[in-house]
Amino acid sequence: MADGRFDPAKDAANRAKHNLPLVFGDRIFEDDNHLIIPSIREIDGEERFKVVGIVGEKLFTGVFVWRGELPRFISVRRSNKGEEQAYHAAG
Protein backbone atom coordinates (compact mmCIF):
# COMPACT_ATOMS: atom_id res chain seq x y z
CA MET A 1 0.00 0.00 0.00
CA ALA A 2 1.60 3.20 -1.16
CA ASP A 3 -0.57 5.58 0.87
CA GLY A 4 1.61 5.34 4.01
CA ARG A 5 -1.02 3.62 6.12
CA PHE A 6 1.48 1.12 7.45
CA ASP A 7 5.19 0.62 7.84
CA PRO A 8 6.55 -1.89 5.26
CA ALA A 9 8.84 -3.42 7.91
CA LYS A 10 5.88 -3.95 10.26
CA ASP A 11 3.92 -5.44 7.37
CA ALA A 12 6.72 -7.93 6.68
CA ALA A 13 6.95 -8.80 10.39
CA ASN A 14 3.17 -9.26 10.63
CA ARG A 15 3.19 -11.53 7.56
CA ALA A 16 5.97 -13.62 9.11
CA LYS A 17 4.37 -13.85 12.57
CA HIS A 18 0.63 -14.02 11.75
CA ASN A 19 0.62 -14.89 8.03
CA LEU A 20 -1.50 -11.80 7.32
CA PRO A 21 -0.70 -8.53 5.56
CA LEU A 22 -1.59 -5.37 7.49
CA VAL A 23 -3.99 -4.31 4.74
CA PHE A 24 -6.17 -7.26 5.86
CA GLY A 25 -7.18 -4.98 8.74
CA ASP A 26 -9.45 -3.08 6.35
CA ARG A 27 -11.56 -6.23 6.00
CA ILE A 28 -12.17 -6.32 9.75
CA PHE A 29 -13.89 -2.93 9.48
CA GLU A 30 -16.25 -4.43 6.86
CA ASP A 31 -18.00 -6.45 9.59
CA ASP A 32 -21.14 -4.40 10.29
CA ASN A 33 -20.82 -5.38 13.96
CA HIS A 34 -17.09 -4.66 14.34
CA LEU A 35 -16.03 -3.47 17.76
CA ILE A 36 -13.48 -0.73 18.42
CA ILE A 37 -11.89 -0.74 21.85
CA PRO A 38 -9.00 1.26 23.32
CA SER A 39 -5.75 -0.67 23.47
CA ILE A 40 -4.37 -1.10 26.95
CA ARG A 41 -0.82 -0.40 25.76
CA GLU A 42 0.03 3.22 25.08
CA ILE A 43 3.38 3.64 23.33
CA ASP A 44 5.14 6.82 22.25
CA GLY A 45 2.19 8.91 23.42
CA GLU A 46 -0.06 7.50 20.70
CA GLU A 47 -3.57 6.39 21.53
CA ARG A 48 -3.96 2.91 20.08
CA PHE A 49 -7.14 1.01 19.38
CA LYS A 50 -8.21 -2.51 18.51
CA VAL A 51 -10.83 -3.33 15.93
CA VAL A 52 -12.39 -6.77 16.35
CA GLY A 53 -14.58 -8.28 13.67
CA ILE A 54 -15.53 -11.33 11.67
CA VAL A 55 -13.93 -12.07 8.31
CA GLY A 56 -14.94 -15.32 6.64
CA GLU A 57 -16.55 -16.74 9.80
CA LYS A 58 -13.40 -16.18 11.91
CA LEU A 59 -12.71 -13.39 14.39
CA PHE A 60 -9.72 -11.12 13.76
CA THR A 61 -8.18 -8.19 15.62
CA GLY A 62 -6.31 -5.23 14.17
CA VAL A 63 -4.28 -2.87 16.35
CA PHE A 64 -4.13 0.62 14.89
CA VAL A 65 -3.81 4.36 15.40
CA TRP A 66 -5.97 6.90 13.63
CA ARG A 67 -4.26 8.95 10.91
CA GLY A 68 -6.90 11.48 10.01
CA GLU A 69 -9.99 9.45 9.19
CA LEU A 70 -8.06 6.30 8.24
CA PRO A 71 -6.58 3.60 10.45
CA ARG A 72 -2.83 2.98 10.33
CA PHE A 73 -2.41 -0.70 11.20
CA ILE A 74 0.33 -1.86 13.53
CA SER A 75 -0.71 -5.50 13.85
CA VAL A 76 -3.40 -7.80 12.42
CA ARG A 77 -4.05 -11.29 13.78
CA ARG A 78 -6.63 -13.83 14.92
CA SER A 79 -8.46 -12.64 18.02
CA ASN A 80 -7.58 -13.96 21.46
CA LYS A 81 -10.13 -15.25 24.01
CA GLY A 82 -10.54 -11.89 25.75
CA GLU A 83 -11.20 -10.11 22.44
CA GLU A 84 -13.67 -12.85 21.44
CA GLN A 85 -15.54 -12.38 24.72
CA ALA A 86 -15.64 -8.59 24.30
CA TYR A 87 -16.95 -8.91 20.73
CA HIS A 88 -19.72 -11.34 21.66
CA ALA A 89 -20.66 -9.38 24.80
CA ALA A 90 -21.08 -6.20 22.72
CA GLY A 91 -23.25 -7.97 20.12
What residue ranges belong to the model's regions?
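Ribonuclease/tRNase effector modules and their secretory precursors
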Residues: 1-91
